[in-house]
Amino acid sequence: MQALHRVRSRLVSERTAVINEIRGLLLERGIIVRQILRFLRQSLPDFLAKRTDVLSLRMAHIVADLADDWRRLDQRIETVTDEIETVVKSDDNCRRVMTVPGIGPIISSAMVAAIGNGVAFARGRDFSAWLGLVPKQMSTGDRTILGRISKRGNAYLRMLFMQAARVILLRPANWPKHGFGCWLVHAAQRLHPNVLAAALANKLARIAWTVLTQERSYEARVTKAVA
C-alpha cells in the first residue's frame, strides 16, 4: 500500500510540475489563465488555435505536448487511485477511518499503511504530533501561547489531513453535521484561515486515531444550532 501511495504522490507532483510549466509558458507570452484547473484544461485548445498572434507554431507544439503529458498523468493517477480504492474496500480499518468527516480512501489507506492499528501511539495527540500538526507552545508569564505547527514527522500524511480540513472549511453549511460544528464556528471567528485549517487537521487526525484504535466507526453528535 505504501508503494502505491509513493507512486501516486510522485505522479501528482509530476502533474503539478507540468501544469505549472504550461501556465508559465503562456504567461511569458501574455496569456493569463485563471487558477481553476478545469478552466485551463477546457481553454487550452482554444488558446493554441486562436492565439497565434503570440504563440509561434513551435511554442504551440511544445504546449500541446505538455497537455498530452498532463492527460497521460491523469490516466495513470486514476489507475493507481482505483487500485488503492479496491484495497480499501476489503480493509476494515480503512473503512472505519473513512467514517471521519473529510477522510476518503486516500487518507484512510495512507494512515493505515503508515501506522497499522495505531497502538504505537499512546494517545491521539501523540499521533498528531508525529504528523507535525501540534502547534508549538510558548510561555510568557502565566500565559501559554500557541504558535505555528511544527511541520515535523510524516509530511505526506500531514498534507493529506490539511487537504481534508480545507475541503471541510469550504462547506460551512455542513459543519453542524460533523459533530464539531460549534467548535468550528467559534474557531473560525477568531483564527486566521490557515491557522484554522491546521487546527481542524489536528482535530481530524486525533479523531481518526481514536476511531482506528477503538475499532469503531465515527458517530457525529449533530449540532442543532451553531450560531
Task: Please name every model-derived segment.
Residues 11, 73, 104, 127-128, ...:
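Short, conserved catalytic/metal-binding motifs centered on acidic residues
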Residues 1-96, 225:
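Glycine-rich, often acidic, oxyanion-interacting loops/wings at catalytic, nucleic-acid
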Residues 142, 182-227:
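Low-complexity, acidic/Ser/Thr- and charged residue-rich accessory regions of DNA metabolism proteins
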Residues 25, 110, 160, 164, ...:
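Amphipathic alpha-helical segments in well-ordered regions
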